A protein has these predicted regions:
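Short, Lys/Arg-enriched N-terminal segments with co-localized hydrophobic residues
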Residues: 1-9
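Helix-start/capping segments and mature chain N-termini
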Residues: 10-132, 160-245
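Charged, gly/pro-rich active-site loop segments
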Residues: 132-143
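Intrinsically disordered, low-complexity linker/loop segments enriched in Gly/Pro
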Residues: 135, 155-157
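Extended, Lys/Arg-enriched charged tracts that mediate electrostatic binding to polyanionic substrates
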Residues: 141-151, 155
Length: 245
């Protein structure tokens, strides 16, 4: 019962005007939708909004492309970055559906607060999300297992290597067409030495560094023929906490 929350287009009071820079030509014909590799193909548009001088401003939807950012940006040095992940689906009638998008929005702000990142305005988030879904609607394919992966994220962009919270940030949304992540049975192993989080840490936040720390033990598990890890508590490794996806 995933399709319980139909997106309500144009339902947000537009207190903030989002500028749209349109593409010259879609890249959709370059993508093989029958053989997608998760997270490698991206739609025509992306959203970005910058935090400067104490407020979020200049929300823009633009063609997907590279960023220009200082090598001294604090995201590179202190890992001030959080993200979310959710999916949009299209039914056989062409309607687009989301599953509890407000929960994902609330969680990215909760994660941001834990990493001293300013919260993002709800009305801008949903206006941007709705507008992008309309622009990229052809990238959402109907049928079992097909979806559009939605990746909102925030990074610290202030230039400087002092160990302190950034004063500037960039909030972005990317779309990536997706199919089922696993095509068959999934083999898991229970972690006996490594932990995903510790008491008082940032385990409850979707912080970028949490995932980087999982890569090494997950690679060890894959070398042994497993797909993912069941994480245990950090004190005794006796109690199950969560599974990787």
């Amino acid at each position: 019962l995933l399709f319980t929350a139909k997106i309500k287009f144009m339902s947000i009071i537009k207190n903030h005007s989002i500028s749209v820079k349109h593409i010259e030509k879609s890249r959709i014909d370059e993508v093989d939708f029958n053989h997608l590799i998760f997270g490698e193909d991206f739609t025509d548009y992306m959203f970005e909004c910058d935090f400067r001088n104490g407020s979020w401003g200049n929300p823009t939807i633009k063609p997907f492309g590279n960023l220009s950012i200082s090598p001294a940006a604090k995201v590179f040095h202190y890992g001030q970055a959080v993200f979310e992940g959710m999916k949009a689906y299209k039914d056989e009638q062409g309607k687009i559906w989301l599953f509890r998008p407000e929960d994902n929005f609330n969680r990215i702000n909760k994660s941001s607060k834990r990493l001293a990142i300013p919260e993002f305005p709800k009305e801008i988030f949903f206006e941007a999300l709705e507008s992008m879904l309309l622009l990229d609607k052809d990238w959402i394919k109907p049928g079992f297992g097909n979806s559009l992966y939605i990746r909102p994220f925030v990074i610290a962009t202030e230039s400087g290597v002092s160990a302190s919270p950034s004063s500037e940030y960039k909030f972005m949304i990317l779309f990536s067409p997706a199919q089922a992540y696993y095509s068959g049975d999934v083999k898991v192993v229970i972690a006996e030495h490594f932990s995903r989080s510790a008491d008082g840490g940032v385990g409850a936040a979707k912080a970028a560094g949490n995932y980087a720390a999982q890569f090494y033990p997950t690679n060890l598990a894959k070398e042994q023929g497993f797909h993912q890890v069941i994480w245990t508590d950090s004190n005794e490794h006796k109690y199950l906490e969560e599974a990787g996806t």
